[in-house]
Amino acid sequence: MFQKSIMIDIEDYASQAPQYYSENIPGLLEKTLVGQRPGNFLDCGCGDGSLLYGLKKKKCLENWKISAIDLSESRIRRIKLIDPNIHAMVDNVEVLHTVPDQSVDLLVSTQVIEHVDDKKTFQAISRVLKKDGRIYLSTVFKKWYGWYFYRNNGRWVLDPTHLREYYEENQLMGLIFSNGFQVLENRKSLFWFPVADFFVRWAGVANRNFYEKKIVSLLRRIQVPILGYYNWELVLKKL
């Protein structure tokens, strides 16, 4: 998920920031899949596979050929436990050397691009996506008053490993247009933090399926807003 130049051990991060599985998937992504003919699907920076797990559980990827890449070897091993038919590879999203040119019909990248060199990443994505292919992209958008309790380079940040948090649309739109993409959807929604997540992570729960327990699922509905921080979702088409 991260470029190697970041001063963090990728496997340490994978163990310290586990992703838990549930059937929750972004509504905009589900809408995009409904309108797309099945083909080659790539989860770009897949992490532990929480998104792929939800998509598989809801049968959103039937008849799709599924691939996934992440920089962490341990996370790629977990992907193969979700479904051994997923073509899961250790790769850098800034390069995508394991992905052939113009081979992907739908590429998904959720909360990844803020961790990496966005210019290199968009160039790599543009190379592997087919003409008329789609991208579902989500990232962090921060208002001037946004605050969270992590700090990086003297600033309050949502995640201390973020290289950047976008605060103007043109910071990303310039890359989108210069790499030959059209914007089909552009949405922002306030981030809400499930209170239960804090206790789950604090307790170091190892079971990735922990969120599927009914009581935990109900408790996760208790959420607090993260003021000034938005989930920025984009659906793009390669021209």
Residue ranges and their predicted role:
Residues M1-P100, L106-V108, F122, Y229-W232:
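Conserved N-terminal segment of class I S-adenosyl-L-methionine
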Residues S5, D12-E23, S50, D117-A124, ...:
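S-adenosyl-L-methionine-dependent methyltransferase catalytic module, highlighting the catalytic core
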Residues W64, I86, G133, F181-Q182:
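A structural micro-motif
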Residues S74, L96, H115, K142-Y145:
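Active-site loop signature of alpha/beta-hydrolase-fold enzymes
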Residues V108-D117:
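A short SAM/SAH-binding and catalytic strip from SAM-dependent methyltransferases
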Residues K238-L239:
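Short loop segments at secondary-structure junctions
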